[in-house]
């Protein structure tokens, strides 16, 4: 049976908890729902942390957001997926997504920094077992990478579905953290002869390179030119 879906619209703000209130630079934290969604929707790779055999493990993997829920891609042979499906309580995890927006070069080595946006999600991940929800989750994962791609590709067959696993993680315990702005040098360092400022960092897409075996007459999809 498919799990009840969480709300599709973000809350005005997520409620802070002991785990989502930062111990340093608390002024950079935000619980704004729209900001959290925007940071998640812009990313491609999340880092999923959990405990395996008493030791911490962090794995990079693809993810997608559907409403107030994240779907995380994996293989049925991977340890976290097996652990999440082992018992009903699921797998306690911590998931992060980070964007680097600028390199902040100060006059002093100590005050170098980066401008960034990040989201941290705490919760319990569960393996998706409902076939309909699994197909929807896999479509969402494909469309998260390139919007519109799932409708322009062959759907997964039975064998591929059996080899693919998906984790579900609801956005209940969530926080964002970000740094914006320029250099924070000490007043006595301002006259030093060292360049200081911010180097912006941006994501840029190159020209698509067609596969050598592309069927004749296959044109470049509009959703790629729109990237």
Where do the PLM segments sit?
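An N-terminal domain-cap segment
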Residues: 14-71, 81-82
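A structural signal for short, well-ordered beta-strand segments
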Residues: 63, 123-125, 167, 171
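Catalytic micro-motifs at enzyme active sites that drive phosphoryl/nucleotidyl and oxygen chemistry
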Residues: 50-52, 106-111, 154-156
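General beta-strand recognition
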Residues: 69-71, 94, 168
């Amino acid at each position: 049976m498919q799990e009840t879906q969480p709300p599709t619209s973000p809350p005005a703000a997520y409620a802070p908890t002991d785990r989502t209130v930062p111990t340093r630079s608390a002024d950079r934290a935000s619980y704004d729902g729209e900001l959290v969604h925007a940071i998640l929707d812009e990313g491609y790779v999340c880092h999923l942390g959990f405990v395996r055999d008493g030791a911490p493990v962090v794995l990079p993997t693809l993810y997608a957001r559907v409403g107030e829920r994240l779907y995380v891609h994996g293989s049925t042979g991977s340890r976290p997926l097996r652990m999440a499906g082992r018992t009903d309580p699921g797998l306690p995890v911590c998931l992060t997504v980070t964007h680097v927006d600028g390199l902040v070069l100060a006059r002093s080595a100590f005050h170098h920094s980066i401008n960034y946006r990040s989201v941290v999600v705490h919760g319990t991940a569960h393996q998706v077992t409902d076939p309909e929800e699994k197909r929807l989750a896999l479509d969402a994962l494909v469309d998260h990478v390139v919007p519109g791609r799932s409708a322009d590709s062959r759907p997964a067959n039975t064998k591929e579905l059996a080899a693919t696993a998906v984790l579900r993680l609801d956005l209940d315990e969530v926080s964002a953290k970000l740094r914006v702005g320029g250099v924070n040098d000490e007043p006595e360092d301002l006259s030093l002869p060292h360049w200081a400022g911010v180097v912006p960092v941006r994501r840029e897409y190159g020209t698509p390179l067609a596969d050598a075996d592309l069927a004749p007459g296959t044109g470049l999809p509009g959703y790629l030119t729109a990237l």
